[in-house]
Structures are given as structure tokens and as C-alpha cells.
Amino acid sequence: MTDLGWPTTIEYSAPLGRRVRLGSWEDQRVSTYSKIQDALDAEEWGFAAELAHYFVDEASVCYGIYRQWIPDLRAFLRENGISTEDLAAIDADILSKLDLPEGRTWNASLQWHLVRTQGEELVRLIHQHQGEAAHAQLVELKETWRRCHDRDVDHTYGLMSAIVERLGEAAISRMWDKVILPLFIWRYEKFDIDKYPWADSLDTLMLVACEAMRGHLVGPERTGDFELIETDDRFILRFDPCGSGGRTIRGDTIEGTPARMEAPYGWTVSEEPHPWNHFQTGVCHYCTHCIRLMEELPMDRFGYPVRVVDPPRYGVTDESGAPVKCQWQMFKDPTKVPEEYYERVGRTKPEVFGSAALGSPALGEVTVAMPGDG
């Protein structure tokens, strides 16, 4: 998938058990939103309709994950002594901050219904060759999904902040072990070199990385476009910002709301050094799931990270004074990941790799409704 001449197609992926968007890596960094715009401009009606269907597919992966995370975060609070009444108050306080710009009370299932129905209307307009109306509908659909996605992220973040406030930062690692183990089994267990050839796994790893960040609507205009660089030994993805943790610590430039550490939210970021924040302060709790999921868990299970993550930190800027971008690195040979990336999560690089070589125990099956197999 390094040939820049590959066309964009929507095809079934056997490793993922569902359809995905294929094309060159240069093409993968272009959002599905932008691809639909281009197809409409070119009057490629059939292709535009296919992409419109897939835009909702991308969104559905993110939406489905939050349907698991939110109840699991609530359950973690209950399992650690938070009463039903206190939990209800926590939820009510979070939700009171998530009203939509027009003043409507936030309702996740209703908002997702709007995403689905607006997607259907977009496809109808495309099939009727109504280019101008389809462009306007696409803008509305993207904005409806952004509002849905961002409030789910806010809901999860408010719960994470409540966990830290009541149980301390040390609870974050236990929290993630409860919340993201299903995601690890569903998506990341397939990146074990003792089970699958890395040459095949790397393509799949890159595909789901690109798909996920398009679905999260990364980028300053929240379209899902990002940077992708290929070097001799790795792929580098950069998000400015990512649509979840990056937006959390920057604030919402579209709706004009501040970083979630500021009023009216007042949610926390890491203030203590831990392996899952690279022993740094200012890492948002949401971003620590990437370190736990993509670095720590696979290092402990396979002997290598599946991605090396450099999250932004609250209040930290680059040399120009601009907010720091989030960066992911995926190595073409996972056994060649430099030692420094192990040290910053308190690990030592092993001499053998793969779950069998390390004697890793078997994991259970996924018990939540996820689309496909990853």
C-alpha cells in the first residue's frame, strides 16, 4: 500500500471482519469528508454515495467504543465505593455542561439518530445528482457527528476526572485495565508476531490508525485530515489536534469553549509521574489510554509497542508558541523500536518477542458489541 497510484476503494477486510477504505498511504491521510467533497465536485455520484455510507461507518466505530467506555467508567466508580446517589450526581454535573449550541439538552442516542438520518439524506441527494444540496448536507452531517463525538469524549473525560478526584491518580492504571481490555482484545491482539506476520499486521495497524483518526475528526477544522510521513523504518502520523484528547486540552475552537481544565468544566490533568503518562505532568487522562493501550499492554504481552505515542500536554507549546501536535509512530520492524521508548514507560526492552516467547497468558473473548473484528 505504498504505491501512490492506488485508487480509493471501499472493500471487505478479512483481518478486521468488516469493510474499510483502501488506497495509498498518501490517500489514507485525506479525510473521507474531503474525499466526498471532491467526488461531488467531479460529479462522481456513485463513488460519492459509497463514501457517504462509509463516513457513517467510520463514525460508528467511535460511537460504539464510547457506548462501552461510559458504562464501564461508571461501573469502575461503583466498584470502588462510589454510591449510586453520588454517581448520579457526578453524571448530572457532567451532562449539565454538554448542552448543544442551540441550547438543546445533550442526548447521545438522539444525536446518533440524527447522524444516521442525515447520512441517509446525503446519499439520497447524491443519487438525485443534487450537488449543491449534497454539499450543504455533508457539512451538516459532519457537524452533527462532531457534536455527537465531542460530547461523548467530554462525558468520558468528566468521569475520568471524577475517578482521579475520588480515588487518586494511581487509580488510572486500574481504570484503563477495566475499560480498554475489551478494545485490546478486539483490535490489538491481532498484532502479535507469534500469531500473524508483521508485514500483514502493519498494513492492518496502519489502516485502523488512519480510519480511527478520520472518524475522530482530527485537524483544526475537524475534517479528519492529518499528516502522514513514511521513513525508512517507520510511519509517523501527526494530528493538529486529535479530536479527543487534543481538543480536550486545547478547547473547542468551533464552538468557542475552553480547555476542559478551565471553567465551567474544571476537569483535571495528570499532576504526578506515572509510567502511563511517561512520568510527565500535564497529560490529559484521556490521552493516557493511548500509552496504556498502544505501549504498555503490548510491551508486556508481545515485547514491543504497536504504536509509540507522543501526546500533547496541557499548556505546553512548541518553539513557535503553537500548541503541540499529537504524534504516533508505527515501526516497520517492531523488534527494532529504540530502548528509549521502553524506558519512558518504566520497561526494559526484552531479548525475545511475541506472546509465546514471553509466555503471555491467553486473553478472554470480547463481550461487548464491537463492529467486525477490529
What are these regions, as identified by a protein language model?
Residues 2-293, 304-325, 333-374:
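N-terminal accessory segment detector
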Residues 297-303:
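A structural motif corresponding to the C-terminal end of an alpha-helix
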Residues 328:
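An acidic-aromatic pocket/loop used at catalytic or ligand-binding sites
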